[in-house]
Amino acid sequence: MNTAAMSDHIQRLKDDHKDFNVDSLDLNLDSDPYLSFKKWFDEACEKKESEPNAFCLSTVDLKSHQPNSRILYLKDLRDNELVFYTNYNSDKAVQLDTNRKASMLFFWPGLQRQIRINGIVSKVSTEESDQYFSSRPRSSQIGAWASHQSQKLDSSMDIEKRVKELEFRFSQEVPRPEFWGGYALKPIYFEFWQGRPSRLHDRLCFEFLNESWLSYRKNP
């Protein structure tokens, strides 16, 4: 690996950022963090941000105390909870079984915005998981069965073989596997970040304390 070349690229990128030029958060946010999230999410969709429902999910392994992050997709926002789906045998699911605290990060560079959300995660009902799974493309349904997510794989041919076997096994409807389903994150903290000129970015936080939301700002 040519680390010198990589270093050159990093050096060139250090100052290769356009200045931020958006108004202060006071003009953009509601006092209700859920309404503010929906407003920003809708704007990200309307402005054609690339994959606006993509977010980084961070969990922690309690044995090693090692944080782990990966990109997922938000699939629903209901009852003031954010819903995503995964394999219940995956590393993230194993970590969530022992530590239900997790953090989401949405980033929309075109709008110069990001939202960090900390919360407590729980599994959604089997009915909700069934309903979402049935809406997925058949290829994705087969893929959910075929992937032994987070387990070591000797060859990509192994999983391709499983896919062919499963396509034959499920010649018609594909049922949801018991090891696959949804999680819902109940927020206890929101941080809305808006880029501003001279790197004096706005950070407006909402923390759920004593059954109500407390709002405050943080230094950039």
Model-derived regions, located:
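Binding-site signature for planar aromatic cofactors or substrates
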Residues: 1-220
